[in-house]
């Protein structure tokens, strides 16, 4: 612990204090708030995490408040435009020219958060965006019929919101998907919250002393000396190759928690701290909120709805599925049936058309069944 650290950062109820601040502007979504904050600030300050572990998509239908929630969570971090940078509209090549290292050689994305609001599939799946999401340093563009290498300095935490984005397979390895609460109960909480605000002076401002205290967090490396205790539980999952990426993501969530609580951790040297069991338990909560099944495949709310439709119908044809999909169009449904089949969440079978109108084969889909992810808390570790 550093003696000169702000008192807030030495408080075991540090996150509760932050929730009290967020409660001034947000209602519900307790775990979602923590994930956005941890992957944003903890992610950009962790020196020895995987470069893709701090990439997050906040997903929910249009009008659900995902942009508002994400903005209000990040607003508690001081240094907007210096420590965290928000853009509402951005082109797919912007990162190639933005803070170009030729013009700004000393500028870096390290220790920063990039928040992209309402990004579309074209932008998310673009080559340049893949480069920065991977933490790679160079992209090549063609200008005046010449190939030019441009350097991207550093790697930020990347948080984006999206309603209908379709992630290509390559992006699935680089992003976790945070699905928000779309329940009637959450709707009612939001209505009551804004009604109360309207009866008073509106939304309250965050306490500046709390915001300033967050400046006391510094970039550190994290050692997990108990990491050999939980790997076996991931080996038991039916997660195929993606377990390699998401196991590292789980490890890094432990590290992000330790980074946020660094002034309550043992310092091995001036730049390295040790994670504690409570960091493991916190990572369990965050990880099982992000990944609902043992396949460890990130899926959006709409993709989950599509799986549930197929599950309800049993073995069923594309036309029957499309007639039940009221939240998206035919093209989206075709695309996502194929994507979910590739991920192993649906099974595709060709059968004879028994209607008598055609001799063609029909594609049918069946839900494979998803086993809910279960990971033990520290007290239950063997």
Across the structure, where does each feature detected by a protein language model lie?
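Non-catalytic, well-ordered alpha-helical scaffold segments
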Residues: 33-37, 169, 173, 244-252, ...
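Terminal-proximal interaction/regulatory segments of ATP-powered molecular machines
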Residues: 297-382
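Charged, amphipathic alpha-helical linker segments immediately N-terminal to NTP-binding catalytic cores
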Residues: 1-33
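Conserved ASCE/P-loop NTPase catalytic core
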Residues: 34, 39-197, 348-352
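Interdomain motor-coupling "hinge/lid" segment immediately C-terminal to the ATP-binding subdomain
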Residues: 173-239, 251, 258, 267-270
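C-terminal helical "lid" subdomain and adjoining coupling/linker elements of P-loop NTPases
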Residues: 228-299
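Short, hydrophobic-biased segments on the C-terminal half of alpha helices
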Residues: 74, 251, 334-338
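Conserved, well-folded catalytic cores of nucleic-acid-processing
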Residues: 21-25, 29, 39-43, 76-80, ...
């Amino acid at each position: 612990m550093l003696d000169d650290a702000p008192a807030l950062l030495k408080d075991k109820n540090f996150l509760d204090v932050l929730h009290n601040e967020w409660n001034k502007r947000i209602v519900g979504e307790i775990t979602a708030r923590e994930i956005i904050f941890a992957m944003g600030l903890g992610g950009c300050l962790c020196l020895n995490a995987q470069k893709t572990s701090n990439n997050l998509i906040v997903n929910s239908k249009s009008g659900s408040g995902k942009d508002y929630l994400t903005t209000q969570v990040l607003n508690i971090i001081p240094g907007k435009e210096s420590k965290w940078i928000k853009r509402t509209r951005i082109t797919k090549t912007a990162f190639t020219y933005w803070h170009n290292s030729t013009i700004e050689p000393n500028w870096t994305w390290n220790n920063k958060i990039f928040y992209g609001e309402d990004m579309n599939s074209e932008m998310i799946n673009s080559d340049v965006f893949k480069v920065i999401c991977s933490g790679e340093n160079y992209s090549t563009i063609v200008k005046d019929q010449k190939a030019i290498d441009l350097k991207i300095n550093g790697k930020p935490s990347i948080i984006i919101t999206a309603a209908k984005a379709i992630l290509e397979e390559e992006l699935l390895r680089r992003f976790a998907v945070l699905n928000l609460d779309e329940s009637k109960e959450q709707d009612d909480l939001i209505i009551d919250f804004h009604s109360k605000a309207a009866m008073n002076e509106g939304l309250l401002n965050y306490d500046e002393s709390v915001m300033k205290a967050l400046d006391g967090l510094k970039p550190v490396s994290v050692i997990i000396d108990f990491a050999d205790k939980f790997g076996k539980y991931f080996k038991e999952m039916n997660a195929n190759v993606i377990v390699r990426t998401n196991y590292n993501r789980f490890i890094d969530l432990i590290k992000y928690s330790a980074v946020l609580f660094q002034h309550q951790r043992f310092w091995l040297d001036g730049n390295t701290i040790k994670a504690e069991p409570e960091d493991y338990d916190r990572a369990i909560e965050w990880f099982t909120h992000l990944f609902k099944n043992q396949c460890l495949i990130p899926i959006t709310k709409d993709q989950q709805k599509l799986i549930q439709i197929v599950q309800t119908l049993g073995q069923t044809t594309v036309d029957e599925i499309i007639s039940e999909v009221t939240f998206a169009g035919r093209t989206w449904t075709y695309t996502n049936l194929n994507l979910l089949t590739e991920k192993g969440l649906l099974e595709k079978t060709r059968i004879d058309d028994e209607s008598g109108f055609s001799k063609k084969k029909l594609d049918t889909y069946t839900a494979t069944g998803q086993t809910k992810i279960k990971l033990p808390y520290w007290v239950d570790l063997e």
